[in-house]
Each structure stands twice: as C-alpha cells, then as structure tokens.
C-alpha cells in the first residue's frame, strides 16, 4: 500500500453550501473505460447539523493520486441524517444509486453516472416497502441481471438490532426500480448477530464474492462467543 492521500473537493456544492466532513465509507464505485472513477461520497452542509448529502464525483487517477473533476446532482432528505453511504452500479448502459437513510433506504438512476432522478423509497414489485433502513445496501451485477444485497424488517428478526440479519439478495427490475419479491433469497442466515455491514467484490462477469462480518453478539444468545466473518461466492453460467 502507498501512503495515505486526501481527495480535494470544492469548498462549496452546487447550492452554495459548504462541503464538510467528506467521506466515501461503505460505497461501491464504478471504474470507467478511460480510467476515470465515479466515486459516491457523502458530506455535511452544516457542521452543527449532521445531515448528509450524497453525490457521485468523477475523478481521474494517475496511478498515485485521485483528482476531483466534477460532480452531479446532490441528494439529501431534510429529516435526521439525510441520505448517506451511497453505492453505485452500472447496468445495461444506465447507472443505479442506492442510499442509506434512517427511516427507509432510497434508490435512483441516471444515464451518465453523475446526474440522477429524484430518489424514491425502495419497494417490492407488489408496491410494499422493502423495509430496509438505517444500514447500507449494495449492488451485484451478474448473469445478465441487477441484484441488491440488503437487510430488512419482516423476516422474524425483531430481536436483531435494526433488523440487520439475515442478509438477503434479490433481483431488481431496472425499469421500475423495484425489487422482485419472488427472487428474494437468504445469502447469510440469521444467527443472533447483525449482518448489516457487507461488502461486494466483482471478480468477473460470472463471479462475485460477498463478505460480511458478524456484529453485536453481546446483545444476543451468542454473548461472549467469537464473531465470524462470512464469505459467499456467487457464480453464473455467463
């Protein structure tokens, strides 16, 4: 690993508000064919009000340093902590952005990876809310499909903090931005630990790895046990 470097962003966003406490934790980026990087980031507009705004920043990379070039639409909610921990995916020529919020996760899409439609609440294809809240979601693109990795309410999991287990995967309809309920599967079963903080590694067009560390064992029946780190390998026939 090389030395730690900082990405310099403008002092103000498009609305004229200051850009404060920028970070890109828990995000998925998209690397473009020309070497540019589409990096989702979040920031505060007010140091006294911890309400996040999320953007996608286009950056260049020269092999050592990441340099900001531009960013697109700015997305937030007025309540609580706003929209944060954004993750980006490219699928069939469009870009899809999922964002964490305290009450309900949100989703949007756009053509260029920078500018997006107004966000909407994540829902199943029957119109009911997905029930994912106050933790991150991530994308998987494999086998010609677009999938979401998430946790949610309503899975006999009221004993789990913020309903952060089990860890699910389901296919997304890219036209409606809804999760197809019949495709939902459990990636990692609930075992008295939280599973909300997962990661996705796209190995190839036909293989993706999901990693997830258990958390908060002290709150459940496995108190004083050692937590586990789970690895799930997803493959497709092409």
Regions inferred by a protein language model and the residue ranges of each:
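Beta-rich carbohydrate-recognition and catalytic domains
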Residues: 1-22, 30-85, 89-131, 145, ...
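Beta-propeller and closely related beta-sheet repeat lectin domains
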Residues: 25-28, 84-87, 135-138, 194-199
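Active-site-adjacent segment of 2-oxoglutarate/Fe(II) JmjC oxygenases
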Residues: 139-142, 146
């Amino acid at each position: 690993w090389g030395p730690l470097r900082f990405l310099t962003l403008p002092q103000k966003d498009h609305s004229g508000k200051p850009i404060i406490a920028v970070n890109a934790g828990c995000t998925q980026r998209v690397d473009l064919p020309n070497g540019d990087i589409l990096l989702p980031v979040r920031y505060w507009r007010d140091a006294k009000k911890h309400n996040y705004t999320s953007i996608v920043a286009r950056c260049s990379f020269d092999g050592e340093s990441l340099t900001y070039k531009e960013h697109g639409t700015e997305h937030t909610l007025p309540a609580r902590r706003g929209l944060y921990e954004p993750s980006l995916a490219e699928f069939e020529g469009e870009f899809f952005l999922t964002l964490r919020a305290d009450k309900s996760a949100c989703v949007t899409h756009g053509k260029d990876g920078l500018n997006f439609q107004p966000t909407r609440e994540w829902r199943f294809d029957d119109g009911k809310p997905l029930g994912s809240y106050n933790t991150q979601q991530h994308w998987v693109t494999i086998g010609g499909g677009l999938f979401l990795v998430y946790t949610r309410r309503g899975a006999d999991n009221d004993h789990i903090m913020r309903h952060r287990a089990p860890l699910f995967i389901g296919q997304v309809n890219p036209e409606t931005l809804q999760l197809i309920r019949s495709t939902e599967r459990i990636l990692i079963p609930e075992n008295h630990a939280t599973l909300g903080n997962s990661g996705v590694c796209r190995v190839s067009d036909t293989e993706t790895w999901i990693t997830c560390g258990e958390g908060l064992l002290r709150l459940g029946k496995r108190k004083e046990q050692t937590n586990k780190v789970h690895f799930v390998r997803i493959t497709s026939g092409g």
